[in-house]
Amino acid sequence: MTKKIKALIFDFDGTIANTLPYTFSKIIELAKKLKVKDFKEKEIIEKIRSLSPQELFSHFSISWLKMPLIIWEVKKAQKDLYNKMDKIKIFPGIKKLLKELKKKGIKIYIYSSNLKKNIIKFLEKEKIDQYFENVYVGRNLLGKDKDLINILKKEGLKTDEVYYVADEIRDALACQKAKIKMIGVSWGLAGERGLTKTKVYYLIKKPDEILKLV
């Protein structure tokens, strides 16, 4: 017998908040700083959406020695984002989804690699902070599986009692390692094409489709 889903853990960027335009602009800036050879902006965005981090490094011949610089640039972009949060929009249908999940008694969390202060500011701006039990953030961009496992332990949840709702290929790979079922959202970074190849447990096109899964 399948266990009842008790909780949903949401990613933030590209899942709840539409930070994609900001993200893409920063990716282009980073590509220039990394001196990626013969890159075209359209190609960079396309590959970011369809390849894993490891595949991206290989495709653009980026040395892993550049990782500290990349992490530094990502963190700087996140700090800069704080003052732009007022302009970031929530994806259509998310507010209604959160309200319905709460009615069903589903516990809702956020786990993201963004800064906690950015997330809290956005939740309060959109008046949806009351729906979340807790907001977790991680510092390891490529080690989300360990963080997810630790969150489940802290919250007393088992892997078959929870879904992670997210939009990136690295999220899907982390869920596979952690043995957590992921609901992939087609409106985020990887899109339907990118997530299809990672074999996510469910792939949805609209937020309210989640209600059929819990």
What is the predicted function of each stretch?
Residues I44-I45, I128-G143:
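A short, structured active-site edge motif that brings together acidic residues
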Residues I48, K89-G93, N114-L115, R139, ...:
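Short beta->alpha linker loops
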Residues K37, I128-E133, K158, Y201:
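Conserved H-loop
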Residues N83-I110, K116, I120, D145-K146:
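Short, acidic loop-to-helix structural element flanking the phosphoryl-transfer center
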Residues Y163-K205:
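Acidic, Mg2+-coordinating phosphoryl-transfer loop and its flanking beta/alpha structural elements
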Residues A7, D145-A172:
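Conserved Lys-Pro-Asp/Glu-containing loop-to-beta segment of HAD-superfamily phosphomonoesterases
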Residues K3-P92:
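N-terminal helical cap/lid subdomain that shapes the substrate entry/recognition surface
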Residues I62, K104-I106, I180, V200:
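Short phosphate-binding/catalytic loops that engage adenosine nucleotides
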